[in-house]
Amino acid sequence: VSVDAADPGRGDVGGITAAASLRASRATTLRTAHDQVTAAIAEASPEVWTGQSREAFIVGATALAAELSTLAGQADAEASALSTYAQGVQSIKDEQARLELRRADATADLALYKRQKRTADIEATTDMAIGASTDAQERSATYADWIAQSEADLAAVDAAWQDLVSDRE
């Protein structure tokens, strides 16, 4: 199954959870049937029922009880696997939402710092031409640092996003 790199959290957690619940319910039903068959075996005492038909019933019912127990175990295992998978998908969805917010914040910060740096660069050029203070140059250098930090934040978000994609694969 390929993972959509643009949406690593894609999946219906509710649907997966519902499928897990259905299998857990099926396991309960199978265990109830197992208990009923086991009770029927116990009730088929030699005092009540004798002969070959009783023996055939005991053999068949015992085999049925074993099969019901096996099927209940399989349904429980499927329910557990689906529940674990649903939790994993939800965890990825939650992390994806956090990363999307971090990306949006870093992108907005980057755009703001670039605009502010351009303004500071223009002011610094003017200030240098007239021999004024170096405040604008210092602001430009500060914005350059903030731009680098925002770009590093975006790179970290991209790396974490790729980790999500890998986790889902």
Question: Residue ranges of each PLM-predicted region?
Answer:
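N-terminal secretion-targeting helices of virulence/extracellular proteins
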Residues: 1-167
